[in-house]
Amino acid sequence: MSGPTKLVFFGNEFPNDDLKALFRGLHRHGKDRRFRQLATFLEESTRVLQNEVAQLPEPLKKLVPHFENLMPLTEVDFRQGPLGAAMESALLTILELGMFIGHYEAEERVWDLSADRTTLAGLSIGLLAAAGVALSTHLAEVVQNGAECVRVSFRLGVYVHDISRKLEAPQADGSLLSWAHVVTGETASDLQEELSRYNTETGTPELLKVFISAADKTSVSVSGPPSRIRAAFRASQRLRYSKSLALPVYDGLCHAAHLYDEETIHRVLHPDGSVIPTSRPVQLALLSSRSGQPFEATTAAELFRAISTELLTGTIFLDNITAGILDRTERCADAPQCQIETYRTSLVFKGLLKALEACFPDRTISTTDLIPWVFQDYGARQPKSYADSKLAIVGMACRMPGGANDLDLFWELLAQGRDTHTTVPADRFDLETHYDPTGETENATRTPFGNFIDQPGLFDAGFFNMSPREAEQTDPMHRLALVTAYEALEMAGIVSGRTPSSNPKRIATFYGQASDDWRELNASQNIGTYAVPGGERAFANGRINYFFKFGGPSFNLDTACSSGLAAVQAACSALWAGEADTVLAGGLNIITDPDNYAGLGNGHFLSRTGQCKVWDQSADGYCRADGVGSVVIKRLEDAEADNDNILAVVLSAATNHSAEAISITHPHAGAQKENYTQVLHQAAVNPLDISYVELHGTGTQAGDAQEAESVLDIFAPRAHRRRADQPLHLGAVKSNIGHGEAAAGIASLLKVLLMYQKNEIPAHIGIPTVINPAIPTDLEQRQVYLPRTKTAWPRAAGQIRRAIVNSFGAHGGNTTLVLEDAPEKQVTVAREERSTHPVVISAKSKKSLAANVETLLAYLDENPETDLGDLSYTTCARRMHHSWRLATAVSDIPALQKFLRNAVSNDAVSQTRPIPTEAPHVVFTFTGQGAYYAGLAQGLFQALPFFRAEVRQLDHLSQRLGFPSIVPVILGEVEEGTATALVTQLSIVIVEIALARLWLLLLGIPAPHAVIGHSLGEYAALAVAGVLSTADALYLVGHRAQLIEEHCTPGSHAMLSVRATIADIERLVGTGADAPTYELSCQNTHQDTVIGGSIQDLNAIREKLEPEGIKCVNVDVPFAFHTAQMDAVRERLAKAVAAVPFKTPSVPVLSPLLGSVVFDGKSINPEYIVRATREPVRFATAIDAAQELGIVNSQTLWVDIGPHPICASFVRSLVPGARIVSSCRRNEDNFATMAKSLCTLHLAGRTPSWAEYFRPDEQAYSLLRLPKYRWNEVNYWIQYLGTWTLDKAHLKNGGSQKRTITDVPSVSSLRTSLIHQVTEETVDKTTATLKAISDIQHPDFLEAVHGHTMNNCGVATSSIWTDMAMTVGEHLYRRLVPGTDHVLMDLCDFEVQHAQVANTNSNTPQPLALEAHLDLPTRHMSLAWYDVNATTNQRADAPFATGSIKYPADPTGAAWSIEWSRITHLIQGRIEALQHLAAENKASTLSKPLAYALFKNVVDYAPRYRGMDRVVIHDHEAFSDITLTTDRHGTWHTPPHWIDSVSHLAGLVMNGSDASNTRDFFYVTPGCGSCRMTEPLIAGGKYRNYVRMFPMPDEAHMYAGDLYILREDKIIGVVEQLKFRRVPRLLMDRFFSPNKNAAAHAAPAPAPAAVPAVKKQPPTETIQPQAPKTEQKQDQLQLPNLASAAPSTANSSSSPSSSGVATPTTEQEAPVADASAVTGVAGKCLELIANETGLGVAELTADATFVQLGVDSLMSLVLSEKLRSEMGLEIKSSLFLECPTVGDLTGWLEQYC
């Protein structure tokens, strides 16, 4: 019985299922080894898309998220962007083929598609998916062919969008418009007739016409640019009233025969010259959607070409597809069954199915949906194996003992066979007191030896954005990790984001560290702010990630002595696992702590006789060593693609553990051998092919013997001996530089990497006597050697050297790496020689910039044969660029050397300034026709594929519009002066649009801030601004040129450039009847004018002007543009432009026609184009208008786009100081112009995309190993002082203990809403003491705090502390004087040093303590409030608020009443005066809502706090009427909301009066002198209060006043000396930001109620060093007094100290003598400081201290905010402490700002 016929139908739309769910299913199944073909297809498709995306221009690349699989692509809606068509086409192709492959694997189907009974069909992009099946004979071939289908789909989408957007730009608002509408009820022939009529009547160019793209019996699809379709449907009555629907086609035009041709198809299929393999035959019939017949293609190449041609040019005829399928089915007359496979259903498919059922009623027709399988679960499967890429080490850096502070010095040390061990230097610890060879002294070391880095404290803090204090507290090994990481990255040429593998989100760090000497010893002597981030291990590489903005994993590993190499192995694993694409790895060790010496010595690890004696008979332990090293590693394929220098290749790496050793610290040969075997198997390397082993080699008897056994058994076995030409060399770097512990492995690796570079093995110096007898004696017989002298290690031709690097940990870990030679670089790209190259140098400080210049000059002097192109590539594309910059464009090395020498000798560095923090705006200016010359932009066209492709694409569009090609003009094939106006003008506009895209898409210049075009150049400007589509711009330029050629006589009129104003011309030429006739054509500047007229008239004018000394130049154009000569074309041009759509500009357009700036979408219209041809070009007026609006200024960067920078001179004249770069220049090589322009942009802060500049022939350039960055170093070092590591051995639980508040039950019955737990209460006859704890997060307390919010955070007001004081005062008084009815109290000298802010985490306790002591004989009680650590219950040493209570001798209060009665009439008189002023509208009357609305300027009160009903205010005087709430809302002495209601009038006066500068300042109260009441406040009581505030004469910015509280016209309370301090409003956020992540132990943040007063100190006061204080909690803001703010004089030295900051005075320029000599940024900063402090600039002498100048902590905050807001400088307020003098500050500013 014959088999069934099969039809597989591939649609052109995604199924209705969730797209992400579909791809998630594919991705999930792709991890299952049951779906091997699917997995391979997904991997290949991902790789194809990665490669295609990598070829896109930089701005388009940025639209695509990083993806290692397809899932991220499904998360992005690409439809609104330029990659919509490309991504949707590619993803649809992947989805259909993936579902097809997965279905076969899920069903375990064998291939059953026979050529004679199988038909494939598809619609649109579905044809490409179908092609993957049509070319295959089994499933594996579908995988291979399918990847190529994905590639073509993507390219097709990119090209369609690119071409279509040149026909019509996208909407400015991002909305999607359809490029196709379906019309039902019309025939294709009728609609074609209607469309032809419409296109003809409107004069629509063929390129832009509306056309039919698809048709069947019942419907027709109409396609075209969206605006043209809409216009057609509006204009055509037939279309307007038809049944139509917009289709979801948003990315451009397909099926357009008038738009694409054979050359287009070729560019889609072979954009980079690649050729699709032609040997693959077509296996299955695939039907054309145009003819319904199988494509007449026999090979893959032919099939892809046929499909691409059909997609781009062929109309879809659905009826033909149906007919073809029916015909193919009918031919198999014996088939009883028809099986159809498709993806869900669609209208087209339903129609096809209906036709089949109708035609073949006797056949069984079945359908299979290829999608449902993806949602099924096929059981757990094992994942696929990990990637097996080789890895490339591309960068390295180090700091090693013996002065080896770079790689060259390290190699020099090794090559010379030096031993670096010495005794412990004094900067580590005092050897005399800490060394005892007898071992009798507890905690002393028994060995005095070690290997040490020279001055490990040297560090460039400013480079890494660290303050001196932070640098000092940061572990030196962490600092050197940063430094070596940078140097390794620099060597590797890593520039973040330059290539896919340098994506910062995919760069990881792995560092090994096994000790914490600095944190445990040096920094712990005075624990500071940066103790945790400066000392905890995780911050070593965490800081690297943070500084470089790396988003990959950050791991700090401790595997004891193998930590460094284990970190490298972990880094390699991350690369193999796909967790990162580039890794930094290394090891860190800096020795300072004698404890570790003692511990290792007592554990018998250390040698007492000196250096590590590896494999020596006298080996007695290891010698400790410093060391810091970093390496950069990538996958090999990435390194090769990135054109990196590969130092060596990592084949495999592994770590295991000596689990079977006899003790945890004893090595185990068996485990070591297992590890070797594992890495050799992974690398597929024969052990006999290893030619070098770098031993762990500690120099211990046990270690050497075990390692010798393991190495010899595996790499030189007796059973399989090495040949004589297979020697195995061994060595150990520890015999030179000691055992670096965590850095030992990285030191070994660096040594081997240097051996690869130098082709040499250093001598092994570890055997000073004789070889250890435990080592086998047959080494030579086994071809094993420990070279005792330098030994050559050459790389033979065609051979690869392989090496092993070992590192073992004392804890039992074994790490091994297998290395091999880097592959020899194959240069496959011929380099386009450029006449001129840019060279750039940069640094983060002036001093480093000067040093970098000097070192580069020295390098060139030593290497005069250096290739300039390679040098340019290295400095531009492969270096990180910093703010201090020098740049030049040169054509040879001698010219560069001259530039560098001049920079050094003329001190050019000191003249430079750092680039601005915010890059300047860019304006594009487009030149006109006068810039034309033959061969324009020829160099760029020939050398830059991107520019060439852009020109050819634009030229193709132009030709499709019916105009001639302009490429011959660019190639110089047209003689000068022979080109027509049409060709000339098209050449200029095409070149200008292509240049603009070159700047924007390739060279990385951002979208311009504005554009301006001069005459003809305005068409290019409008195209770039999106006003005109590219196609319309070319159409108008070409059509206008044709009209001019046809209707204007060339040579009859001309244009004359005159160096004079139009007024001067009129005056000199005259206006009489016999005066020559002329017209204004162009007003280029205020002194440059172009006039036009007949030749005769212009000659006559010239004869009049030149004798007057006025320069005149004929403009080289054949017509007089912008004159009456253009009148002949106006009407015809108006008709041509009428149908052209105009869009709202995407950037401002400086209009030379209107002399203004255009922002809207109506000003530029068809009439504008006609007027611009006839009317003058008012270039100067347009520029003036832009300057007036602030769109351009002296800081603006101008990019002149055109063949010659004609507009540049105009801009320079109009905009003083304008910076202009050119794109091309007549009679100058294009790359000479471009190089200079790129340098100018780079120096201005608009760093070009250097990578793209060199991309076309990057593989032909070499990355040079130039001198490393020269640091501006200072020695930040905290010296270990004393002998406390020895002394602690003798302490037996002694020493003082901090007073703590323990968590015990309350000892008193006192408990209120604010006092929660009394921990101590003692009472005797005359004194009483109470200590209590309260929790701000307690509901009652928290509600009180939130009644007074500032900057959205709850702040404890003074009324809270007042209630607590009165509560405790009354309680203790009654304990001493029982039976007292009413206790009168006077709260005196109340001052809040810093207020409390409620943490946002209410689940975390926020405790505080109150301590009170009452002395009855003196009738006085002292009060103090303290912060409390919630974790330890330990209270702070210093209180945050203090006060006292005085108890009057008269307990009735009569004395107070009498006192106040004497002034009551005065207060009443002032209240009446204010009422009178209010009646005359001279004082303000505020209602309650208005009063509290004013208060919101600073503080927002809860409703219960809003007691003031009415306020009358005049200047700083006011009274208010008050009604208290009727509810106490808690348990209080006096509710805080009542206290606030009767007292916060003073706050309103200061913060709401027009007499206060509330715009720049706000006012907060630090306390009062006295607060007393003769009677308690009553619920619902009505009161009146009065206050007048005065400035305090003895304290700047402080106000004080007395506030009176009256009830029924009687004074019942007074708050005396109520103070308010003025605070700059710019500090609002700094002071009053809520702490959202407060830790459990944290104390509250500050509030506006208590910015502390800064007490003035005598300027001559000697500031003494401060004792260590309790660490300031992260959410407090303590503004210290001057004495505590100023650093001690001992702290201002850069020599080792135990204090705090090492101020960099010795390494920087000496401070200037006086402020008047300071210029630049430093000078401006001093002017700002003088303005803010009220000092004269002359008073800011270099030796003046900021303490003496009155710059207190509050002023420091103000100055830092001012410097940020006004000068853009991010400067911490602590800088005024770290740079205590004006000279220190200016030195710092000159270096880093």
Curated annotation (Swiss-Prot):
Pfam families cross-referenced by the UniProt entry: Acyl_transf_1, CurL-like_PKS_C, ketoacyl-synt, Ketoacyl-synt_C, PP-binding, SAT
GO terms, molecular function: 3-oxoacyl-[acyl-carrier-protein] synthase activity; fatty acid synthase activity; phosphopantetheine binding
Domain of life, source organism: Eukaryota
Gene3D superfamilies: 3.30.70.3290, 3.40.47.10, ACP-like (1.10.1200.10), Malonyl-Coenzyme A Acyl Carrier Protein, domain 2 (3.40.366.10), Polyketide synthase dehydratase (3.10.129.110)
Assigned EC number: 2.3.1.-
GO biological process, any: secondary metabolite biosynthetic process
Top EC class, one word: transferase
Modified residues (O-(pantetheine 4'-phosphoryl)serine): 1753
Keywords carried by this UniProt record: Acyltransferase, Phosphopantetheine, Phosphoprotein, Transferase
Catalytic site: 561 (for beta-ketoacyl synthase activity), 696 (for beta-ketoacyl synthase activity), 739 (for beta-ketoacyl synthase activity), 1348 (proton acceptor), 1540 (proton donor)
Pathway stated in the Swiss-Prot or TrEMBL entry: Secondary metabolite biosynthesis
Boundaries of every PKS/mFAS DH domain copy: 1316-1629
Biased composition (Low complexity): 1642-1659, 1683-1706
Catalysed reaction, written as an equation: holo-[ACP] + 9 malonyl-CoA + acetyl-CoA + 9 H(+) = 3-(2,4-dioxopentyl)-3,6,8,9-tetrahydroxy-1-oxo-1,2,3,4-tetrahydroanthracene-2-carboxyl-[ACP] + 9 CO2 + 10 CoA + 2 H2O
Chain positions covered by the region annotation Malonyl-CoA:ACP transacylase (MAT) domain: 923-1245
Region C-terminal hotdog fold, annotated ranges: 1482-1629
Region spans: Product template (PT) domain: 1312-1634
Recorded domain comment: Multidomain protein; including a starter unit:ACP transacylase (SAT) that selects the starter unit; a ketosynthase (KS) that catalyzes repeated decarboxylative condensation to elongate the polyketide backbone; a malonyl-CoA:ACP transacylase (MAT) that selects and transfers the extender unit malonyl-CoA; a product template (PT) domain that controls the immediate cyclization regioselectivity of the reactive polyketide backbone; and an acyl-carrier protein (ACP) that serves as the tether of the growing and completed polyketide via its phosphopantetheinyl arm.
PANTHER family: FATTY ACID SYNTHASE (PTHR43775), NON-REDUCING POLYKETIDE SYNTHASE APTA-RELATED (PTHR43775:SF24)
Name of the protein this chain belongs to: Non-reducing polyketide synthase adaA
UniProt organism field: Aspergillus niger (strain ATCC MYA-4892 / CBS 513.88 / FGSC A1513)
Gene label: adaA
